[in-house]
From Swiss-Prot:
GO BP of this protein: biotin biosynthetic process
Pfam family membership, one: BATS
Binding-site list for [2Fe-2S] cluster: 110, 141, 201, 273
Pathway annotation from the record: Cofactor biosynthesis; biotin biosynthesis; biotin from 7,8-diaminononanoate: step 2/2
Alphabetized Gene3D superfamilies for the sequence: Aldolase class I (3.20.20.70)
Subunit details: Homodimer.
The protein's name: Biotin synthase
Organism: Haemophilus influenzae (strain PittGG)
Tree of life domain: Bacteria
SUPFAM superfamilies assigned to the protein according to its UniProt record, in alphabetical order: Radical SAM enzymes
Family the UniProt entry places it in: Belongs to the radical SAM superfamily. Biotin synthase family.
NCBIfam families in UniProt: bioB
Amino acid sequence: MLAEKLQINSITPHPSVEYWSVCKVEALFETPFLELVYRAAQIHRKHFNSRTIQLSTLMSIKTGGCPEDCGYCPQSARYHTGVQNQQLLDVNEIIAKAKIAKARGAGRFCMGAAWRGPKPKDIEKVTEIIKAVKSLGLETCGTFGLLQDGMAEDLKEAGLDYYNHNLDTAPEHYAEVIGTRRFDDRLSTLGKVRKAGLKVCCGGIVGMNETRKERAGLIASLANLDPQPESVPINQLVKVEGTPLADAEELDWTEFVRTIAVARITMPKSYVRLSAGRSGMTEEMQAMCFMAGANSIFYGDKLLVTDNPEEDGDQLLMAKLDLEPETAENKK
């Protein structure tokens, strides 16, 4: 299948890691719901403290005006979504936000820029920002798009810990969502990131009119990366008026929980992050996601330009569920 060929040609699965065919992952999705969640919960407890949640804060440091045509994204210059373009923020403004994030319990500060990919002059500014955030004692993560040769090394030298570069969706469904880049382009940048010694944050989006088999294809593609991503954000589509996917078919909540569980089973040592779309989830649905193996969230009232639950609400939910922020002391 295309997903398998792309993986083998671009990033070969490690022989010590179980290889996940699309058919094998699809079979997991077909597992009876409660049995699937139970299996995922067992695997989660084997590798992580089940009472801790890793907290990250995400900030848009350059907003809007992106030339890409991603059908889900309100930051594309091709769509009229009401997003106001904003050039790269001043380092002092970013540091002020990072200090607030740390004071509120975040251990990682993630920065996103709406570029197809950064130019060399952008990297100079971004490395300055990374150094400043790193000096606060926070882990750093960046999502800046497709990288040219040498850029990942520059980011690593500046102190970047993680690079986020999502696969978005299954290779078979990719052209239905994005036309300005190829699935292989994502794999190419991920290869550069790994070669530079950076940790990888790589996930995708569900609810973009994909089939269950295509959801399985996304998870298989992620699980077969070598090595597997340290962090796997699973996003539920946030429908934004003006984007091509504004009228996408609603995904049943159990299917999203299944996706979390399958991600946990296939990537047992990765952090599985409950990402975009969480503001539209009930507390009960989020609790099921945590039971199914999600152990990381974005903490803060914005995810780039979309809404996210407020910190007070997250603190209350964590208290109800007897969960606490992950620290070096309570990490398994």
